[in-house]
């Protein structure tokens, strides 16, 4: 009987590994053709956790079978490193520039009180970043002028762009370096968009791309239901219904984001083919294992994967934890000490910070 149990568990472990591989490499599927399968990368940590449980089981009951989950981790090393990088500590060398990417959720200005200092704007100013890319940077009512004054007093060069349609979304760049030009990257979306800026960074033209790609459009009710579901406070029927509802929304958003990612990637490649240095920031609304991440990061370095540690969750509302905000750079930059800064929680996103050091031309 014990032998039957051992072999049954071994088969289950092998099945799990195949599923973990399918989920870990789901970003190679085009969401236009396989929207459901392409969204499975969000569930990768659940499969990792299950494989860790198998490690514990084999350590206790049959250590010679430990090779099965270990092999699974080895086969999934590329997506595992994307999702959960580990790097030695690195101090930014002299001459590095500091880059900040932050979805500020309208600076949370709806909830500001009279004479209150906006904590998000204060954080941006005190970050002392050289280049700041903000998403959802539109301000509400009378607080806008006060926030603008704080930011513009620190940053002499800035461009704030509203969405060309009816969306309230704004994208902004604040910089210590001159902004030579700016333009919108053309792709279809009713609510989201991407901006490209050419900056003069210490005498060199650098393309900076600021993205806010298609939202998953989860309503407050959706997020509240997900919160209740993760706490075990929904019935089985309600949980199944809500899971399908959320999954359908994720798949639909993926189908819209895929051509946006293609457009941004093509735009960046055009500049890279001309030899221009590139820094990419933004809220991608997609996981590190997604088609979106893979396409936009193609030929670039993910600064968090290269120099950060841990899962680095940037979205943190309603018990939804995922890294959807990124900083990428071309290979003429070396990233240092990239981190998700959890000190400021007024937005539903945490900011991402990284130091970049220009590398000598090869």
Feature locations, PLM:
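N-terminal, active-site-proximal structural segment of metallo-dependent hydrolase catalytic domains
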Residues: 1-150, 163-171, 261-265, 359-362
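Structured beta-strand-rich core segments of catalytic domains in phosphoester-bond hydrolases
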Residues: 72-94, 111, 131, 135-229, ...
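Metal-dependent phosphoester-hydrolase catalytic domains
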Residues: 8-20, 25-58, 64-71, 183-185, ...
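Active-site beta-strand/loop signature of hydrolases that rely on acidic residues for catalysis
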Residues: 98-104, 116, 120-144, 161, ...
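Structured loop/turn residues at beta-strand edges in well-structured enzyme cores
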Residues: 95, 127, 153, 177, ...
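Conserved beta-strand segments of alpha/beta enzyme cores
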Residues: 98, 156-157, 178, 207, ...
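Short, solvent-exposed loop/turn segments at secondary-structure junctions
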Residues: 105-107, 139, 177-179, 213-216, ...
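Acidic/histidine-rich helix-loop elements
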Residues: 101-117, 139, 217-253
């Amino acid at each position: 009987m014990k032998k039957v149990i051992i072999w049954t568990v071994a088969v289950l472990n092998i099945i799990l590994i195949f599923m973990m591989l399918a989920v870990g490499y789901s970003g190679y599927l085009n969401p236009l053709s396989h929207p459901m399968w392409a969204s499975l990368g969000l569930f990768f940590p659940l499969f990792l956790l299950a494989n860790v449980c198998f490690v514990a089981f084999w350590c206790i009951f049959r250590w010679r079978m430990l090779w099965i989950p270990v092999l699974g981790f080895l086969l999934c090393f590329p997506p595992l490193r994307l999702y959960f990088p580990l790097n030695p500590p690195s101090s930014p060398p002299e001459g590095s520039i500091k880059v900040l990417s932050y979805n500020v959720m309208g600076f949370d200005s709806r909830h500001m009180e009279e004479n209150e200092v906006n904590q998000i704007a204060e954080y941006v100013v005190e970050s002392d970043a050289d280049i700041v890319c903000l998403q959802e940077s539109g301000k509400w009512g009378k607080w806008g002028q006060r926030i603008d004054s704080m930011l513009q007093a620190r940053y002499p060069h800035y461009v704030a762009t509203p969405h060309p349609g009816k969306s309230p979304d704004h994208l902004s760049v604040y910089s210590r370096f001159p902004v030579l030009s700016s333009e919108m990257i053309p792709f279809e979306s009713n609510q989201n968009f991407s901006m490209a800026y050419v900056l003069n960074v210490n005498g060199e033209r650098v393309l900076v791309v600021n993205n806010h790609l298609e939202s998953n459009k989860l309503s407050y009710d959706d997020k509240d239901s997900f919160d209740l579901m993760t706490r075990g406070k929904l019935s089985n029927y309600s949980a199944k219904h809500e899971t399908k509802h959320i999954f359908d929304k994720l798949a639909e958003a993926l189908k819209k984001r895929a051509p946006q990612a293609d457009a941004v990637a093509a735009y960046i490649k055009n500049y890279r083919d001309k030899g221009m240095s590139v820094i990419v920031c933004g809220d991608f609304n997609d996981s590190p294992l997604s088609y979106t991440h893979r396409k936009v990061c193609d030929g670039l370095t993910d600064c968090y994967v290269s120099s950060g540690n841990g899962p680095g969750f940037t979205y943190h509302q309603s018990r939804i934890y995922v890294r959807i905000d990124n900083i990428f750079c071309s290979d003429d930059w070396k990233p240092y000490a990239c981190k998700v800064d959890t000190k400021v929680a007024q937005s539903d996103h945490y900011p991402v910070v990284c130091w970049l050091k220009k590398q000598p031309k090869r």
